[in-house]
Every structure is written in C-alpha cells, then in structure tokens.
Amino acid sequence: MISKRKKKSDTKVYALGQHIRMSAHKARRVIDQIRGRSYEETLMILELMPYRACYPIFKLVYSAAANASHNMGFNETSLVVSKAEVNEGTTVKKFKPRARGRSYPIKRPTCHITIVLEDTTVYDEYVISHDTYSSGGLWDKK
C-alpha cells in the first residue's frame, strides 16, 4: 500500500474576490478552464482568453500566489489551482427612465470568486507500507 506523507499541515493558500460586477454564469465559464492546472499555465490561459471575466480572475490568481510566496514561503512554480469556485452575490437593482413617465428595472448581478492554490512539493515523498494482517494473496486461503 502506498500512502502519502505530508511535511507541512498548511499547504493551501486562498484569495477571495467579492462583489465582482459580472454574472456568475459567465465567470464559471472561465473558472472551469483553469481548475486543476499549474499556476504558470493558468496565467498563460487567462492572458490569452478573450473574455471579460479573465481579468478579475487573473488578479485573484496572482494575489493568491503572492500570498503563498509572502506569507507561507512557497515557490510559485510548484503551485496548483486546487479549488476554484464562483458563487452568486447580491444583485444591484436600478431603474432606467423610459418614455411617458415609466421606468424599467435593470438588474446587475455580482459574484464572489474563490481561488485556492496548493503547494505540490509536499506530495513528492511517498511511503510504502506493507499490510501486516494479510497472509499473502487470494490463493493462499484454503
């Protein structure tokens, strides 16, 4: 049996962006592309994608990496986006004046974006442990 041994207990660093003025559905379209990728690959993807949601997500990933290097001392090349989620925020409601004294409501949705980066150097060391309770294989039993 192969098990993983962790060196440090805290390997995750996060950045949270709240009340970003964009639809959660449009931000999820970009977030789904970067989930599980390395930090450098994520920055490259976000710079080349043509969506408006890329810039605030780029700033959050960059901020999370700065938190990892400054607060925890992690190397930026070994960071991976382990968790990236988008939640709906409050809706900003306005009224648009129209003809003959009428008004139409305008709803501007907001979203909350959470980016979690994890250090992968912790999982470099593997430990092989043998199960002491098994007598061998399936064919040893009578």
From Swiss-Prot:
One of its GO terms (biological process) is translation. GO terms for molecular function: rRNA binding; structural constituent of ribosome. GO terms for cellular component: chloroplast; large ribosomal subunit. Pfam families: Ribosomal_L22. PROSITE patterns: RIBOSOMAL_L22 (PS00464). It is found in: Plastid, Chloroplast. CDD domains: Ribosomal_L22. Coiled coil: none annotated. Keywords: Chloroplast, Plastid, Ribonucleoprotein, Ribosomal protein, RNA-binding, rRNA-binding. This protein binds specifically to 23S rRNA. The globular domain of the protein is located near the polypeptide exit tunnel on the outside of the subunit, while an extended beta-hairpin is found that lines the wall of the exit tunnel in the center of the 70S ribosome. Part of the 50S ribosomal subunit. Belongs to the universal ribosomal protein uL22 family. This is Large ribosomal subunit protein uL22c. The gene is rpl22.
